[in-house]
Design a protein with these regions (language model features):
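Core catalytic alpha/beta fold that binds nucleotide/phospho-ligands
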Residues: 1-128
Length: 128
């Protein structure tokens, strides 16, 4: 078993400026993420996008060593959703046998100026 971690912090003002470009939104976020964030209003909308951006970065940092260089992971292949218990969850949207042996936990937090996320990935290497 190997444990991998990732963390990221982002200024919400940076994401606010990026959100002015529709291409940024559709390039980085999935439909589920966009629907969730757009359901929020004012600062909560920006904080939601910012937290998801940080979570994608943190998750990428935690899993990239496991999957790359075989798989080039892009933004929309890491999806951050809220599960039925109201906790953030990572959905990996690419095919790999390694996903079966992987568990990822993510934690998000934000205030007006910053969003931060941490990710912990536990990978059970199966010997053949």
């Amino acid at each position: 078993m190997k444990v991998y971690t990732g963390i990221d912090i982002i200024e919400t003002e940076r994401i606010k400026k990026s959100l002015e470009d529709k291409n940024f939104i559709t390039r980085v976020f999935t439909e589920k993420e966009i629907t969730y964030c757009e359901s929020r209003r004012n600062d909560a909308r920006i904080q939601s996008y910012s937290a998801r951006f940080a979570a994608k970065e943190a998750a990428y940092k935690a899993i990239s060593e496991i999957f790359e260089p075989e798989i080039k992971i892009d933004w929309k292949q890491i999806e951050i959703i809220i599960d039925e218990t109201k906790r953030p969850k990572v959905n990996l949207k690419f095919e790999s046998e390694k996903i079966k042996n992987l568990s990822i936990d993510v934690s998000l937090s934000h205030i007006k100026e910053y969003a931060v996320a941490s990710a912990v990935a536990v990978y059970e290497e199966k010997s053949e």
